[in-house]
């Protein structure tokens, strides 16, 4: 009887998942050397640009300048690329945009275009033309991520389908062409999860429509090496004659300081091994309302920030010096 009473407690427990290997040699998958037809925003001949989205305390001119300036001061260098998010109706060329451009930095514009079918019905032509002219006026080459992460399930109501997204992409790009915009490199940027599911390629507009391929990749809900998280994307992108930008990457606070530092060191090695990756941008933000597995800011985490600092100071990521 005594042994029977304890039976439930003595059942073998499932083994914990193995710890991720963050110290092995990363796989070299996307290794094309170019030269690439990448549009006006040209990739470096060797190495990669480095950048970030830095969430300001206030979404104002002063707030944006302060956020970027504070991070760059801590890093001891200017970032090559600044990721900036715009709603459909928000035009490029703000005061802070102009200030960053005057400092010699480049913009990656993440533009949240709206419902694809309403775009195709011509409901937003005036707005699209206004954005095209605004980008043309800044003259400097920019990276434009038209409705990045279009493959997310929670965007399906406005994306409708891969075919609708592709048609809207071509429609918007044609308006830019008719407005004589010649300083945009078109960046197609789904999620790493979309490649794991297998549906992200359904949204690809085609090699003749895209200048840079891109992916957003996070160690958020699960702690895996970046090479594993984006391997399906890299295998796909290796077959495209395009440079790659890692549009957003991050490792969540939930995984602890030492693990975050190891993950970032592994990310640096992975970027170097896959030399088709020509730009990377960290997501330096703790979005409001998110739990620890969706908070990615490195500032304030000494070990993790030190690992990122090592990445941005490495000669491989200082191609404009």
Segments from the language model and where they lie:
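N-terminal carbohydrate-binding/catalytic regions of secreted carbohydrate-active enzymes
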Residues: 49-138, 263, 269-274, 283, ...
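Boundary/entry segment of secreted carbohydrate-active catalytic domains
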Residues: 6-91, 321
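C-terminal motif of bacterial Sec signal peptides marking the signal peptidase cleavage site
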Residues: 2-4
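Solvent-exposed loop/turn segments at secondary-structure junctions
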Residues: 57-58, 87-90, 113-117, 148-153, ...
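Active-site cleft segment of glycoside hydrolase catalytic domains centered on the general acid/base Glu
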Residues: 126-212, 216-232, 259, 289-307
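Conserved, mostly hydrophobic/aromatic
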Residues: 82, 144, 211-213, 248, ...
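Aromatic-lined carbohydrate-recognition surfaces of secreted/lumenal glycan-active proteins
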Residues: 51-55, 173-198, 243-254, 279-285
């Amino acid at each position: 009887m005594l042994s029977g009473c304890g039976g439930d407690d003595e059942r073998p427990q499932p083994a914990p998942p193995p710890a991720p290997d963050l110290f092995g040699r990363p796989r070299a998958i996307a290794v094309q050397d170019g030269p690439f037809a990448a549009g006006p925003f040209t990739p470096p001949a060797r190495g990669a640009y480095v950048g970030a989205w830095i969430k300001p305390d206030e979404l104002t001119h002063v707030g944006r300048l302060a956020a970027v300036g504070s991070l760059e001061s801590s890093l001891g260098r200017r970032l090559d690329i600044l990721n900036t998010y715009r709603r459909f109706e928000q035009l490029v060329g703000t005061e802070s945009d102009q200030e960053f451009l005057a400092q010699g930095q480049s913009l990656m514009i993440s533009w949240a275009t709206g419902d694809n079918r309403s775009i195709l019905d011509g409901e937003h032509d005036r707005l699209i033309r206004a954005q095209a002219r605004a980008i043309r006026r800044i003259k400097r080459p920019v990276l434009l991520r038209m409705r990045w992460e279009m493959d997310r399930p929670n965007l399906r109501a406005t994306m409708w389908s891969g075919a609708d997204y592709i048609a809207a992409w071509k429609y918007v790009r044609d308006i830019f062409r008719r407005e004589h915009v010649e300083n945009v490199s078109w960046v197609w940027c789904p999620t790493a999860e979309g490649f794991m599911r297998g549906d992200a390629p359904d949204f690809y507009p085609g090699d003749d429509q895209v200048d840079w391929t891109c992916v957003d990749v996070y160690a958020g809900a699960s702690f895996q090496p970046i090479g594993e998280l984006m391997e399906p994307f890299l295998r796909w992108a290796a077959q495209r004659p395009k440079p790659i930008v890692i549009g957003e990457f991050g490792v969540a606070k939930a995984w602890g300081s030492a693990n975050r530092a190891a993950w970032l060191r592994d990310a640096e090695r992975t970027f170097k091994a896959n030399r088709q990756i020509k730009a990377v941008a960290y997501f330096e933000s703790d979005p409001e309302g998110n739990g620890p597995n969706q908070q990615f800011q490195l500032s304030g985490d000494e070990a993790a920030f030190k690992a990122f600092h090592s990445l941005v100071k490495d000669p491989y990521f200082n191609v404009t010096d």
